[in-house]
Amino acid sequence: MLVLTLAFSAFAIGGVFAEETEPLSSFAVSAKGSGADSTALGTVSWWKSDVDGKYYMFMPSKSDLSSITVWFTATDDVMCGGVKLENGAQTRMFANGGEFVLSVGNAKYTVVFLNSSKLPTMFINTPEGGLDRIHADKSHKEKGCTMLALNSKGNVDYDAELASMKGRGNSTWGYPKKPYNIKLGSKAKLFGMEKAKSWCLLANYEDLSLLRNQIIFSVGAEIGLRETPDCRSIDLYVNGEYKGVYLITEKVEINKNRVDIFDLEEATEDLNPDLDFSTLPAQGFYGKYSGSLESTQRWYEIPNEPADITGGYLMELELGSRYPNEASGFVTKRSQPVILKSPEYASQAQIEYISGYWQEMEDALYSDTGYNSLGKHYSEYIDTLSYARQYLIEEWSGDWDAGITSNYFYKDANGKICAGPIWDFDSAANNVRAGHTISDPMQWNAKTRTLWYNALMGNDTVKATPNIYALGFRHADFVETVESEWKNNFYHAAQSELNANIDMYIDNIKDAAIMNAIRWDYYATTSEREIEAQYFADLKVVTDFLSARTDFLNQNLTLKNEGLTISHIPSQKRTGSEITPEITVKCLDRVLTEGVDYTVAFSDNVEKGTATVTVTGMGDYEGMEAQTTFKILLVSDPLDWTGGSGEERAKESLNNFGAKFVDTVELILYYIVKPFKK
């Protein structure tokens, strides 16, 4: 096999070695696989634990330990249980797994064989036997890598060269266990997922359960967010070294099997076949603070572009501090940075079109009525069903990044903006290890989130500005869509995930999770029993949070929770009879109808003092109630300037002036007429 052959040479120059002065400085094995079409697995090198000083052989699933080939670098014979091991030869010595002592002269090495059981396996080998160049620069694309991918049955899904391997991620790139992007030499189906070239290897270093992303992606797909990335947990080996449990996912990209919309980037490139877009000078607003400059864009001067530039666009909400690192994008007039993932190098016309479209949508969402100054409703710009579903994912998961970063939207040609694909939940579901988290399942998250310090000079008004999910809750029709989706769709998907699917994930991953915990020293112990107990405790944090979250949303995610509001009622003049001024009753931005949506009752509304108005919902608003008050004044009372808008206070002032004028005229007439009365 191509990968296996290269693995041996990689081991020789860059495997996992003991100190070079050690009598046994390297040790590696290769086991036969049990799959129908696989004859050998990749090479696995030993790894030394700083916790107990032992060397671990983390073996992939489907390993036949009864037929292991060993390779080593030693100064003398290598003995195990009184039997000499032959370099490059097969042995049955390790058939039952467990702990063994290797000896070279007087030096002894304890080697522990651990076995994954049900996960697919990926072996990658780099041409120089290391990852130093990638780790020094995550954007560096390593060429000449090879990959062997074995599915959960041990059969080969891919055995060929990679086009490239590089680093990925923002905060996750700073962890010891690194995430990567790989690009295959040709499209392939990996582990039952749809055929593609580009894939992501997520490390999930901060997620001790290793399952947060997988759980939430599964629910996203179940509720109908069709662009949700498919994913599988795998064991990853690079140059023979076990890297732990990774989550291989479909990349967020425009592709027939990913985000299936018109590829504007490809169409633009086709019209400029000899142009390297990355060499073009950047235009617009760039630099360190460009992500904080409202109503700005960044683009490239591209000679030719398609006639139709209405799509497709793949966009991501991003932090202002990260925005300068991206090629193209725009910042809305309310300081929301939006980067273009595709087209990565956008023309000025493309940026002006999509930023203008987004701005009109934002204006409509920010308005009290849901309509912008052009008279267009926000639902004319964004697909409200995907918008509601993505909100529910962000809310239910307790995602700290909700509406801040890793939130994607896309727009097809002549279509509306759609929400998705969902992405990046390793810090969700009460992951206190990640630093930023929502730990209380009984509080709102996405519904109340604001923009994240995106303004220049720490503009506090921006920090208090609702982000895109919170904006939806200004509008009754959005809340109704969310409520309907929760009751008829999301709740059942969440229950199914928590009550059935998670058990399947655990069964598949638990053995590998123990290996991963030892490899990355999660619990400062190598005891399998202690690690298993700790792992299940960490997993319980996730399931307890999501279960409580489900209960909280089931009780509170309803339009009735938003309440009714009654318009300000100006002070009224005493007439001696009941005073029943006209009122406007709303639920969010929806004006309700008396007798259909509510009943109204007045009390203490005859004599001078404070009258009370009570509105009781009916029909769709049954169970909702609101109260307000207004003042009843005598003519001689001073004007009341409290409450209401400036316009309402002006009207009240005029009404009071009119009332006093009429009363004054009546008083004068009374004294003129009085002498003639007998």
Question: What does each model-identified segment do?
Answer:
Residues M1-E19, F657-K678:
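Gram-positive cell-envelope targeting signals
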Residues Y175, Q336-I422, D426-K560, G643-A650, ...:
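Middle-to-C-terminal accessory/interaction subdomains
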Residues K143-A203, S347-Y353:
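Conserved oxyanion/phosphate-binding beta-strand-loop segments in alpha/beta enzyme cores
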Residues N96-G98, Y109-V156:
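N-terminal module-boundary/linker segments of secreted carbohydrate-active enzymes
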Residues F11-L119, L559-G646, A650-E652, N656:
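Beta-rich interaction/scaffold domains
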Residues A188-K189, A203, G224-P229, E241-L392:
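Internal "kinase-insert"/substrate-recognition segments embedded within catalytic cores
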Residues I134-D137, M193-K195, R212-Q214, Y246-I248, ...:
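Short, solvent-exposed loop/turn and secondary-structure capping segments
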Residues I223-D235, D399:
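Short, well-structured beta-strand/strand-turn elements
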